[in-house]
Structures are given as structure tokens and as C-alpha cells.
Amino acid sequence: MQHIFAFFCTGFLGAVVGANFPNNIQIGGLFPNQQSQEHAAFRFALSQLTEPPKLLPQIDIVNISDSFEMTYRFCSQFSKGVYAIFGFYERRTVNMLTSFCGALHVCFITPSFPVDTSNQFVLQLRPELQDALISIIDHYKWQKFVYIYDADRGLSVLQKVLDTAAEKNWQVTAVNILTTTEEGYRMLFQDLEKKKERLVVVDCESERLNAILGQIIKLEKNGIGYHYILANLGFMDIDLNKFKESGANVTGFQLVNYTDTIPAKIMQQWKNSDARDHTRVDWKRPKYTSALTYDGVKVMAEAFQSLRRQRIDISRRGNAGDCLANPAVPWGQGIDIQRALQQVRFEGLTGNVQFNEKGRRTNYTLHVIEMKHDGIRKIGYWNEDDKFVPAATDAQAGGDNSSVQNRTYIVTTILEDPYVMLKKNANQFEGNDRYEGYCVELAAEIAKHVGYSYRLEIVSDGKYGARDPDTKAWNGMVGELVYGRADVAVAPLTITLVREEVIDFSKPFMSLGISIMIKKPQKSKPGVFSFLDPLAYEIWMCIVFAYIGVSVVLFLVSRFSPYEWHSEEFEEGRDQTTSDQSNEFGIFNSLWFSLGAFMQQGCDISPRSLSGRIVGGVWWFFTLIIISSYTANLAAFLTVERMVSPIESAEDLAKQTEIAYGTLEAGSTKEFFRRSKIAVFEKMWTYMKSAEPSVFVRTTEEGMIRVRKSKGKYAYLLESTMNEYIEQRKPCDTMKVGGNLDSKGYGIATPKGSALRNPVNLAVLKLNEQGLLDKLKNKWWYDKGECGSGGGDSKDKTSALSLSNVAGVFYILIGGLGLAMLVALIEFCYKSRSESKRMKGFCLIPQQSINEAIRTSTLPRNSGAGASSGGSGENGRVVSHDFPKSMQSIPCMSHSSGMPLGATGL
């Protein structure tokens, strides 16, 4: 019964894990020769695979230069149900293969020469060489040289060289030796000798390259003064023994470094293999194409294992597909396999194996080798980021690095976001691949530049490193280095004096300082009259006084200046013997003129005198500056939501007790306050060490949580870089206030006297000069931020205007309208009451006398605004009718009293 139950459980688990995923994966193989080293490497790589699914090869031996045969074999394997095909091609067959792969969605993995294609279903294992070749030519400062090439490899490298030659004014003589005979070689080199061409680039495959070098030796063109650059990735695959004694200089590239740990281990396993197919391999010089073949098999294995873990159904059911169907029917699961292949990344025989979105190798390193009469030596390396790095840099970085490269170093670090973090699916990885973060990538770059293998180990106590005051023992990462448990510390480890006494630091890879983290306060709501905020209260008061003062001055100068008074124009029929002088700038008109100018609206009157115009001009200039300044500030004040921070600096913290503040329990920040002699920091340290409950926290995460839960009653002191990172993480409720309290840096630490000190130091300087350190910080701080482009980094956030921002403007409008209605009502009542009183006292005058008085009266020439109103006008004159003297003595009786009234009673 137990056996049945166990069998059932095993079957159920297998069905869950590998649901819809085949246990056996058919892969194709197209090889030009069954006895080739590449074929042996292919079979050996398959024999080393242990994890499911199992790769079953379908191998065909084919003439890779025959398009018809290649088409037949390709379609045959596709019809048999292969999931991917590994093989070689030549110039005559590459277009056919890429066309079929793109149409059918079948992935083709090849170690052949790279081609410029946008077909992502062709995975090119061989790195591109053109950029590295140009870097070497530029390093040697060649201006005139010969480029010998084989057209069978394509023309991409030659085209790149010619394009660069046009930019840099190089003189390049290109020679195609595809069909060159032995006599042709002789004539070629004789012609080059006549032209004194002794700088030559040879771009050929290894077999043809050996033949060309043989002709060079035979024609004795390998003496002193000749310099050959071999545009080939297998410098060690070529027989150069006869060049050692000749004096010629030969430079080339080596993709595989068989002295590295991984290649040496794999090569030893291959050499010791008992498989019969491997016995004919030349173990002294395995070719780089064989290493590419081995890595190609591993690429396929890694991709299918990834698909199996993700439970992606790629099984081929029913008809396997017709290769020659018209129109071609693409394989539905092909795109999933293509994506999985491009996402593979591992350290293989050829170094870092990684592909870009076009299926080409990326992030690879080429070793630059040179052979002179004194032997073969490495003169540097080339990669996509650094370009060519001469070996002189390596020598300065610690002399001979062979001792560095012959062991695996322990790199201690600490789990701290975003420096070192466990991946979400860390249980699916092993070793260094389980981690990600700024320091993880930095450690990889340092190891690549120095040239050593390493293993990341998280410090057991989770501390950076401090000395116990009682036992004098070091803990944390510093203790790991001091007591020999680690070789390097790559972490946010602050460079301090006490640490520098026991360990060595590199140059800082990041500059920072102690900063203050608080909980982000609530945004303050704008006041009703927030539109007045752009100018201070004192300025508004000064503007009011200036307005009144200008109006009074304008009134006075208008009264004193004779040019401000003017006569009214006479109307036709008016007696011109009388002359009325008027002045438009009474006190009310002066106030109205000043208000109109300040509001930039103007009015109907303007000063006539020079003094009045001076007053108006300076007032206009004053209002121009004030209004412009107000408008400039108004946009910022109305569209920015402001947060009122309870503290803005360390001084604010020190002089209050309501908000508690603390640091990490063991770290450089605590040591800074403990050792500081600055009064403010001494006061803060006195508070922190005596505060109850304790204000110190064990981890940065604990401090962050305490800030968030304290409701603004706790401030955490930490490095500015970590503060900025936390500010960018959800729930985006913390913020950095004030400037940094000090200035320091993070460094890579090594034990005292370590051989890694100088190499690591120079590597950090190089990464800084290349801008890689800034790129890494932007990647892990801001590109991966969760608080938007503004993030928590800004205390002010631009937003649209709300009604509360401009409510005061509407209140003033409503108030002004109400006041106008009230004043109009008062004016109406006052006028009605005045008219009523006047009418009651009006005397009765005979109609004939009144008519005669009206006919004989003299009217002013220009009634104007003041004349039409009667009584005293704004212009300072009195307008009245001039009745004849005969009418002035007419007696009249009041209706009320019957008393006689004179003309003056009117």
C-alpha cells in the first residue's frame, strides 16, 4: 500500500512540474565533417548534461557551402520535429538559413562568422571582431596598411574598417585572396614590398590563415619591420613557431583563456573522457570554434531548462510542419524558445555568454596577444565598455596577476537595499547568481577588471563593523577581513580613520554624508488669500503707502503747476468775456489715476505738466517692476503644494526635545557623533546616548520602520545615499531634510597588505572615469524608483490649481460687487433726500419772468463733466446761470411761509 501511495505522489508531482513539457528534446546538428573537433565538442557537451530535459541530437554531415544540400538537410531535420538546430554556414548558404529560420520561427545556433541580420531566430555564438580590430589599429597608430581578407567570411569587418578609415584619414589597401594561388601570393607580396607596405591586417579563417602565413614565411616577408594583425579569435590555434626567430611582430585576439578556472576544468574533463568519439582530438590546441560549440550546447540546455521551470508548453503535437509550404507556416512555440535562448547568461568556455535582442554576443572580453622574437605575451584585453585596455594597466595594478587569478576569493558583503538583495526567485539559482544590486554588479566589474574569481558571502552578524569597547574585537565585515575570513569587502562600507587602521580601503566609489530622514509631513492647504503670498506682508503695506503717497503728490503738483490748469472750450453763443480755469487732478481723480496705473488698466485722464508726468512715469516704472515680480512668483506659489517640515537641519533637531532621533547601533554614523567636537553634534550625542527608550536601531530597515510608525516623532540619521533610496520606495512617506552633516565615501576594503589592494584601487578609478559608477547608481536608485519622476526627492510637487488656491480672488470680486451695490443705494438715497429738501424750498416765480430769464441767460461754452453736474465739480469751479439783474429783485412767496425772498434765495 505504501509503495502504491509513493508511486501516486511521485506521478502527481511529476505531472505538476513538467506538465505539457516533453522529457526528451530533439535538437538538430549540421556539421561539415564528422571527424572535426567541433563535432566531438558537440557530443561531449551533450554527455555532460545531467538535468532534465534530455537533449537528443539529430546530426547530419553536410557540405555547408552547397545551398541545395543545406536546404534539404535543414528541412529534413525540421520535419523530424527538432526544437532548435545547431550548425555552421558559409557565405553562400547564410541567407538561405536566415530566411528559413525567420519564416518558420526555428532557432539556429551557430559558431560561424557573425552576419549583419535583423533575424532574431539566428543566435550567433561568435563575438563580433570589428570594433576590437579598430581599437588595436588605433592603438598602434597605423595610418597606412594593407587589409587582406577572405570574401567567404562576409564583408562586415572590412566595411567597418573602411568606414573608420574615411573618418580618420587612414590609407587602406584591401586585397581579396579568395581565389589567390601560390603565384598570386608571390606577386602580391612583391608588389607590397615595392610599395614598402609592411603593416598588414589578415582577416581569414584559421585554415586559410595558416596557408597565408606559410606563404609569408616562404617568401621571407616575416623579418624585422613587418607587423601583422590577425583578425581571428583563435590566436593560439595558429602555428606561429617560425615567426619567433624571424623578428616580425604578430598581434591577434584570443577568445578562450584556457588557464582560467572554468575552461581548465572543462578541458580536463574532456581530455579524461572515455568516450570513443573524443580520442582523436588534439588536446594541445583545442580551437576556439570547439569552445563555441560547447557553449552553444549549454545555451540550448539552459534555455530548455528555463522553459521547463516556467512550465511553458513547447511540445510539438500532430504535424511537425512543412518546411517548403507556401506560404510558410511559422511554428507557434518558436518564439518562446527564441526568447529563452536570448535570455541565457552564464560563464562558459568563451567567457561570459550573453546575447542582445538581435541574437548577438554582448558583454564579452577578448584577450589581445602579441608575439615578438622574445615570445608570446598578453598585451591587454578588449571589451565593449572599456575598449582596449593595455597590459601596462594590469602591471600597475599589482604587477603579475597570475597569483590573483589562480584562486577563488571570498567577497564579504551585507544584505542592504539596493546594494545587495536576494532575487525573488533566488532558490532557483546558486552561488553569486542568487543576488542582485549595486554592489553585486560592482563586485562583478571589479573582478572582471582585476581578473579573479570570487564568491559572495553575506556577513553572518549583519553588521558593517565596529570595535567592541570592552573586548577590542571587531565585528561585521571589518572583522571578517581582520581575522582572515574574507579577502574583499564590497559593500556600503564607510571609509573611517578607525577602520583604516586595521584594513585597507580603495578610492571611494560613492560619495555621501550623514543626513536626516523624517516622515513626510502632510501637505499644507493653501489659505483663502494665498494669492497674496508671492509678496511679503511688509511689501504689501509699502505698496499701499506708496499708492496713497503718489496720489497725494500728484494732486499737489497738479495744483501748484500752472500748466495743469487749462481753460474750458467755449460753446457757440457763450459769452467769451468770462474765463473758467479747470484742473482735472483733484484728490479723487489722482487716486483713480494711480489705481488704474497700478492695475495696468489706465484711465481717461493724464497729466499735462512736466512735474505731473514725472510723477506718473516713476509710478508706472514702479508698478511694472512690482507686477512683473509678483506674476513671476505667483505661478510657483499657486501651482506648488508645499509641505511644512517640522525640522530643516541638525540645529533644529538639537534645540528641541519633542522629536526623538537616533542612528544605527553599530556603524560609522554613531562613531561620527561620538567623536565629534562640534557643539551641535556633541549636544545631539549627549541626548542620544541618554535617551529612554533607546533611539538606536539594529538595522537600517528597523530605523526606516520606526520613522514611518512614529507619526513624525522620530528622525533617523543615516547616510544620504540610503536616505535617497528609501525616499524612492513605496509607500513614499519618508523624506530627506536639510543638507549633509559631513562628507565621506564608501570604499572597497581589503586586509592590510593584501595583493588585491592596488588592482582593486585602479579598477575603481577606471570605472569612475568611464562613468559606470554613475550609471549603476542611476539604475538602482532612480530607474527602479517607485515614487514617480519627482519621487520623494522633492518637498514641493507641481499640480493643477484648485479652488482653494484662488478662493480669495472670488471673495474680493463678490465683496466688490456687493460694496458697489451698497454705495449706489446710499448715493440714491442721499440724492433723493437732497432733492426733496430742495424742492420744498423752491419759490414760485411767474412763468413769463422765468422764460425771459432763461432766454437772456448766458450758458457756459462747454458743459463738460463738471458743468453738467451743477454745484462744485471735481475740477474746482462753480457753474451757475447768470440771470439778469431785473430778475434778481423779483419778490416771491414760499408756499410754506409766504415770506418774500430775494434772488439769493434761489
Curated annotation (Swiss-Prot):
Residues 558-584, 604-609, 827-906 are cytoplasmic. Residues 19-536, 631-805 are extracellular. Coiled coil: none annotated. Pfam families: ANF_receptor, Lig_chan, Lig_chan-Glu_bd. The chain crosses the membrane at residues 537-557, 610-630, 806-826. Residues 585-600, 601-603 dip into the membrane without crossing it. The keyword Phosphoprotein applies. Residues 1-18 form the signal peptide. One of its GO terms (cellular component) is synaptic vesicle membrane. L-glutamate binds at residues 492, 494, 499, 668-669, 719. A lipid is attached at residues 603, 829 (S-palmitoyl cysteine). Residues 861-880 are annotated as: Disordered. Keywords: Cell membrane, Cell projection, Disease variant, Disulfide bond, Endoplasmic reticulum, Endosome, Glycoprotein, Intellectual disability, Ion channel, Ion transport, Ligand-gated ion channel, Lipoprotein, Membrane, Palmitate, Phosphoprotein, Postsynaptic cell membrane, Receptor, Signal, Synapse, Transmembrane, Transmembrane helix, Transport. It is a multi-pass membrane protein. It is linked to Intellectual developmental disorder, autosomal dominant 67: An autosomal dominant disorder characterized by global development delay and impaired intellectual development apparent from infancy or early childhood. Additional features may include behavioral abnormalities, and language and sleeping difficulties. Homotetramer or heterotetramer of pore-forming glutamate receptor subunits; heteromeric assembly can be the result of both receptor subtype and flip or flop form and according the composition, one partner can be dominant with respect to the fast desensitizing current component, whereas the other can determine the steady-state component. Tetramers may be formed by the dimerization of dimers. Found in a complex with GRIA2, GRIA3, GRIA4, CNIH2, CNIH3, CACNG2, CACNG3, CACNG4, CACNG5, CACNG7 and CACNG8. Interacts with HIP1 and RASGRF2. Interacts with SYNDIG1 and GRIA2. The M4 transmembrane segment mediates tetramerization and is required for cell surface expression. The postsynaptic actions of L-glutamate are mediated by a variety of receptors that are named according to their selective agonists. This receptor binds AMPA (quisqualate) > L-glutamate > kainate. Ionotropic glutamate receptor that functions as a ligand-gated cation channel, gated by L-glutamate and glutamatergic agonists such as alpha-amino-3-hydroxy-5-methyl-4-isoxazolepropionic acid (AMPA), quisqualic acid, and kainic acid. L-glutamate acts as an excitatory neurotransmitter at many synapses in the central nervous system. Belongs to the glutamate-gated ion channel (TC 1.A.10.1) family. GRIA1 subfamily. This is Glutamate receptor 1. It comes from Homo sapiens.
